[in-house]
C-alpha cells in the first residue's frame, strides 16, 4: 500500500496537527490494527494506514469540522449532520482523500466509522473500530 516515504508524510502531518497524546494514540491504534488484521485475515498495510489516520480530523475546531461535513462528497445523512461527536470521522474520511489522495473504499470506511459501529461493517472498519478501543 503506502511506502515508507508516504507513511512519513502522514506521520509528519499528524505530528504538526495533533497533540502529542493524540499522535501517540494514533500510532498505537495503527499498530493494534496491524495485529488484528494479521489475526483476522485483513490487509495489514491498509489497517496500518487507516489506524494511523483515523483521528486526522480529531483536533480540528467544531466549526471547521461542520464546514467539511457540510461540503463532504460522502453520503452523509441528516442525523449525522447534527451529531457533532461524529464529525471528526466523517471529516477525517474526507480529508484523507483531499490531503493524501487516498481513495481506497476500505480505508475511507474505516476512518469514517471508527467511532460508531454500523450494520454490515467491512472487516477493516471493524478492526480499526476495535483497535481504537483497546
Where are these regions (language model features)?
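N-terminal glycine-rich anion-binding loops that anchor highly charged ligand groups
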Residues: 24-25
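Divalent metal-dependent catalytic cores for phosphoryl transfer on phosphate-bearing substrates
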Residues: 9-17, 34-134
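Non-catalytic interface/linker regions that flank or bridge core catalytic/transmembrane domains
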Residues: 1-4
Amino acid at each position: 500500500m503506502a511506502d515508507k516515504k508516504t507513511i512519513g508524510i502522514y506521520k509528519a502531518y499528524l505530528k504538526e496537527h495533533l497533540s502529542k497524546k493524540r499522535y501517540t494514540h494514533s500510532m498505537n491504534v495503527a499498530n493494534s490494527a496491524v495485529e488484528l488484521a494479521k489475526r483476522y485475515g485483513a490487509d495489514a498495510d491498509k489497517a496500518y494506514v487507516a489506524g494511523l489516520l483515523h483521528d486526522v480530523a480529531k483536533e480540528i475546531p467544531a466549526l471547521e469540522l461542520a464546514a467539511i461535513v457540510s461540503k463532504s462528497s460522502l453520503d452523509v445523512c441528516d442525523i449525522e449532520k447534527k451529531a457533532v461527536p461524529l464529525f471528526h470521522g466523517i471529516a477525517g474520511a474526507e480529508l484523507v482523500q483531499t490531503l493524501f489522495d487516498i481513495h481506497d473504499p476500505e480505508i475511507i470506511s474505516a476512518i469514517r466509522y471508527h467511532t460508531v459501529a454500523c450494520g454490515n461493517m467491512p472487516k477493516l472498519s471493524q478492526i480499526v473500530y476495535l483497535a481504537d478501543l483497546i
